[in-house]
A protein has these predicted regions:
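Conserved ABC transporter NBD signature motif
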Residues: 65-76, 80-81
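ABC ATPase "signature
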Residues: 222-223
C-alpha cells in the first residue's frame, strides 16, 4: 500500500521585478493506493500531478507531509523503498548508443538482480512488452513507442512492488499504448500497486480502479469511475472531468 499524508509543495516565483510570490503546487493531498489496484491521478496541465508523483517517488522533497510504503517511509527506509519502486515519466531519457539488452543488463546489475537470473529476466520482459524484434538494436534507432517500451522494461527489471507512472502512454501509437496498458493490468493481477497519471480519460476509465482528480494542487474528487460519473450525472469520465474542473474554477 502507498499512503500519502497531507503532502504539500511550495514554490516561489517572481511576480514582478520587485515582488516574489509563494504558491502551493500541491496543497495538502492525502490518499491511499492498495495492493492489486490501479489508481489514476487526473487533472489539467499545471494541476500538480507531476509534482505530486515526483514527491511520492522520492525524487522531490515535500515542503511538508510524508509518504508511507506499507510499513516503510523515506526518512527511515529510503534505499529499501527505491529498490522496490519503479518511476517512469513520459519524457524519461535513456542512452541512445546502446541496445535495450545492454541497458537492461546494466539496470539489473544496479538493482542487484542475481547474475544467473538476469538473462532469463530480460527475455521474459522482452516477451511481455513485445521487444524481441528490437532487443539488440541501437536505442537511438527506435521509434518513440519502442523507446517507451524499453523505459517500461527498465522499470520492470527488478520486479518492483510499487509503480508510479506519469503519462507513460503520452504521444505513443495505439499499439505501443495498448502493450503498456496490458502490462499494467497484468502487474495489478500480481498484486502490485500502481499510481498512474494520464490526460486520456477513456484510458483512465478502462484501466483504473479508482481515480483522484486534482486541480490547483487540491483533490477535488475521488472515487471509482462509476462513482464519479454518478456524482456528476454524466455518462463518461471525460464529461465528469470537465464538469468538475469547470465547477472548481468557477468557485475561485
Amino acid at each position: 500500500m502507498i499512503k500519502v499524508n497531507d503532502l504539500k509543495k511550495k514554490f516561489v516565483k517572481q511576480k514582478n521585478k520587485k515582488e516574489k510570490m509563494e504558491f502551493y503546487a500541491v496543497n495538502g493531498v492525502s490518499f491511499e493506493a492498495n495492493e492489486g489496484e490501479i489508481v489514476g491521478i487526473l487533472g489539467p496541465n499545471g494541476a500538480g500531478k507531476t509534482t505530486l508523483l515526483r514527491m511520492v517517488a522520492g525524487i522531490m522533497n515535500p515542503t511538508s507531509g510524508d509518504v508511507q510504503f506499507d510499513d516503510m517511509n523515506y526518512k527511515r527506509d529510503e534505499i529499501k523503498i527505491k529498490k522496490s519502486l519503479a518511476y517512469l515519466s513520459g519524457n524519461t531519457k535513456i542512452y541512445n548508443s546502446i541496445s535495450p539488452y545492454e541497458l537492461l543488463r546494466m539496470c539489473a546489475e544496479f538493482y542487484e538482480v542475481k547474475k544467473d537470473e538476469i538473462d532469463n529476466r530480460i527475455q521474459e520482459i522482452s516477451r511481455i512488452l513485445e521487444m524481441d524484434k528490437f532487443l539488440y538494436s541501437r536505442i537511438g534507432n527506435l521509434s518513440t513507442g519502442q523507446t517507451q517500451r524499453v523505459n517500461i522494461a527498465r522499470c520492470l527489471i527488478h520486479d518492483p512492488k510499487y509503480y508510479i507512472l506519469d503519462e507513460a502512454t503520452s504521444g505513443l501509437d495505439i499499439i505501443s499504448s495498448q502493450i503498456i496498458l496490458d502490462f499494467m493490468k497484468s502487474e495489478k493481477k500480481k498484486g502490485k500497486c500502481v499510481l498512474y497519471s494520464t490526460h486520456y480519460m477513456e484510458e483512465a476509465e478502462n484501466i483504473c480502479d479508482r481515480v483522484i482528480m486534482i486541480n490547483h494542487g487540491n483533490i477535488i474528487k475521488e472515487g471509482t469511475p462509476a462513482e464519479i460519473r454518478k456524482a456528476t450525472k454524466t455518462s463518461n469520465l471525460r464529461d465528469a472531468f470537465f464538469a468538475l474542473i469547470g465547477s472548481d474554477n468557477n468557485e475561485e
